[in-house]
Amino acid sequence: MKRTWQPNRRKRAKTHGFRARMRTPGGRKVLKRRRQKGRWRLTPAVRKR
């Protein structure tokens, strides 16, 4: 059986990236909550090379 985690930087960015979050009202709420909470990172790091 294929595992659930198949790493892919592009899909990660498209799904969970900052611009993806900003695109929807729900995503903006996520960012707002994470800012209120004082998270260092609002979205997962994708561009690490």
Swiss-Prot record:
GO biological process: one example: translation
TM stretches of this protein: none
Signal peptide per UniProt: none
Coiled coil: none
Superkingdom per UniProt: Bacteria
Amino acid composition bias (Basic residues), ranges on this chain: 29-49
Any single Pfam family the record assigns to this protein: Ribosomal_L34
InterPro entries, A to Z: Ribosomal_bL34, Ribosomal_bL34_CS
Cellular component terms (Gene Ontology): ribonucleoprotein complex; ribosome
GO terms, molecular function: structural constituent of ribosome
Keywords: Ribonucleoprotein, Ribosomal protein
The protein's role, per its UniProt record: Found on the solvent side of the large subunit.
Quaternary structure (record): Part of the 50S ribosomal subunit.
Additional note from the record: The open reading frame (ORF) for this protein is entirely within the ORF for the RNase P protein (RnaP). The two start codons are separated by four nucleotides.
Protein name: Large ribosomal subunit protein bL34
Organism: Thermus thermophilus (strain ATCC 27634 / DSM 579 / HB8)
